[in-house]
């Protein structure tokens, strides 16, 4: 059975009440790298008001995710062509079914396996996020991928 975005939205909780469910940052270096990324993007697009940058915020995308708390949000994500306003989280069903256009994960020893495996597959197969990058602030490992015909192809790394 398929349903429209409006039917799906009517089944979901009010997004204004869904606060981000993200854990604390891994380290002060992790925080500094994330702050630098956000600052650079906001400065680069300082005269625009048609984007949203989420940092350490949950992306709510399904009822199962809400019920099982099975997914932690990206370290950083960007959504283009949307209204720039404060949000407590990104709630897909209240944003017209929109998923992030860009995701960046900052790797750590405790998250690298998930960021390179299950999260990459989720961003590719479910979110269909056009570009995905990861960076390890300690080892300086950098990799980037662009969605091409439904599959991430390396563009960096």
Where on the chain are the PLM-derived regions?
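Gly/Pro/Ser/Thr-rich low-complexity, intrinsically disordered segments predominantly at protein N-termini
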Residues: 1-157
């Amino acid at each position: 059975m398929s349903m429209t975005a409006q039917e799906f939205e009517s089944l979901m909780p009010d997004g204004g009440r869904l606060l981000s469910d993200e854990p604390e940052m891994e380290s002060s270096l992790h925080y500094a790298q994330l702050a630098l990324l956000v600052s650079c993007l906001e400065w680069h697009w300082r005269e625009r008001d048609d984007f949203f940058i989420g940092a350490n915020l949950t992306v709510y995308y399904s009822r199962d995710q809400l019920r099982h708390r099975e997914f932690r949000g990206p370290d950083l994500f960007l959504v283009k062509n949307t209204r720039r306003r404060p949000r407590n989280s990104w709630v897909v069903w209240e944003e017209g079914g929109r998923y992030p256009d860009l995701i960046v994960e900052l790797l750590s020893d405790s998250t690298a396996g998930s960021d390179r495996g299950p999260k990459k597959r989720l961003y590719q197969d479910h979110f269909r996020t056009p570009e995905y990058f990861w960076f390890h602030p300690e080892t300086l490992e950098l990799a980037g991928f662009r969605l091409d015909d439904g599959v991430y192809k390396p563009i960096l790394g």
